[in-house]
Amino acid sequence: MVQKKSQSGKTVTVEQIGSPIRNSQIQRATLKGLGLNKMRRRRVLEDTLCVRGMIARVRHLVRVIDED
């Protein structure tokens, strides 16, 4: 599967601040898709609409630290 690179090259840093315990399976899968599975983990991701949608879905469990 070929992934397209973002045109602008912008990135977003996301940190997990909440536990997925007592949350739905979809929210757990979304965290896993973002590369987060333990508290205080940080990931630098491409700033795309898909990533923004995933962040919005679990906005109560993550914090956006930096947007470049």
UniProtKB/Swiss-Prot annotation:
Annotated InterPro entries: Ribo_uL30_ferredoxin-like_sf, Ribosomal_uL30_bac-type, Ribosomal_uL30_ferredoxin-like
SUPFAM superfamilies assigned: Ribosomal protein L30p/L7e (SSF55129)
GO CC terms: large ribosomal subunit
Entry annotated with the keyword Ribonucleoprotein: yes
Keyword hit for Ribonucleoprotein: yes
Biological process according to GO: translation
Entry's Gene Ontology molecular function annotations: structural constituent of ribosome
Keyword set, alphabetical order: Ribonucleoprotein, Ribosomal protein
Quaternary structure note: Part of the 50S ribosomal subunit.
Entry similarity comment: Belongs to the universal ribosomal protein uL30 family.
Protein name: Large ribosomal subunit protein uL30
Species annotation: Bartonella tribocorum (strain CIP 105476 / IBS 506)
